[in-house]
Amino acid sequence: MEAQNQEVAALVEKIAGLHAAISKLPSLSPSAEVDALFTDLVTACVPASPVDVAKLGPEAQAMREELIRLCSAAEGHLEAHYADMLAAFDNPLDHLARFPYYGNYVNLSKLEYDLLVRYVPGIAPTRVAFVGSGPLPFSSLVLAAHHLPDAVFDNYDRCGAANERARRLFRGADEGLGARMAFHTADVATLTGELGAYDVVFLAALVGMAAEEKAGVIAHLGAHMADGAALVVSARHGARGFLYPIVDLEDIRRGGFDVLAVYHPDDEVINSVIVARKADPRRGGGLAGARGAVPVVSPPCKCCKMEAAAGAFQKAEEFAAKRLSV
């Protein structure tokens, strides 16, 4: 325990130093200095760590919250920069690999799809919403192009400029793909009846920066999504919680969803993935109701441990060691 405490203290000290350096930057637009500092930050946060960011002291918690805002702003600048670069090509979709993290989105989208079809049996989405799509809507693009070829995607972002950049990427795109991707400037909190039309809603990590905001977004989705519809949430775990918000599974349950599976990566894919389903009274709840158990899929899916609801852990049968390719 003492060794773990020392490891956590050293990590927090390192990240605090990086936070101080990033805070002094004159701009968060892409540059050698910005890229180097954020690379150091990601490198520090990706390895497995015993840190529980929810238990940090007030000073460290304030630093973390500010760092998440800085990461969000820097990511926005980076994506806008590359969206403009890609838009200069006659067919931007032929050049997506120029974005340095495009491969991560390809892997993440495959992971999300694999988890969705595994834990929501029989799902065949025809209408999908992606909330928080941004200027580079790689996740919805890859899902639409490679995994859900029959689905129409409605991408929502509060920023009109981000949506305009996203639309430009589809100039010269194949008519089928381009026709299935729509972009809407809206805050998810203003969506009501629209949400009931979707088979699946994907919620990006940066929608709802603070814990109470995230809980509010999830509760709103739960109030308006159709019974039985799936919710796929991008989240963070462990030290990766210094980069993006953590999602509390209890907030998802309180929002009216059954949590079906949780995946925490141990590779360059930063995102954890949570698969949930809007509770359907006609079915008496889902696989993981308020008192059920949730599969925590441990990379590389050699086994699945069962996490009991309400914070308790119950032993469950082991799943076959079928590898979930990411």
UniProtKB/Swiss-Prot annotation:
Tissues where the protein occurs: Expressed in roots.
Disulfide pattern: none
InterPro entries: Nicotian_synth, SAM-dependent_MTases_sf
Domain of life: Eukaryota
GO biological process: nicotianamine biosynthetic process
GO molecular function, one term: nicotianamine synthase activity
One Pfam family, short name: NAS
Enzyme Commission designation: 2.5.1.43
Reactions catalysed according to its record: 3 S-adenosyl-L-methionine = nicotianamine + 3 S-methyl-5'-thioadenosine + 3 H(+)
Transmembrane portions of the chain: none
Annotated keywords: S-adenosyl-L-methionine, Transferase
Induction data: By iron deficiency in roots and chlorotic leaves.
Family label: Belongs to the nicotianamine synthase (NAS)-like family.
Function: Synthesizes nicotianamine, a polyamine that is the first intermediate in the synthesis of the phytosiderophores of the mugineic acid type found in gramineae which serve as a sensor for the physiological iron status within the plant, and/or might be involved in the transport of iron.
Name assigned to this protein: Nicotianamine synthase 2
Gene, per the UniProt record: NAS2
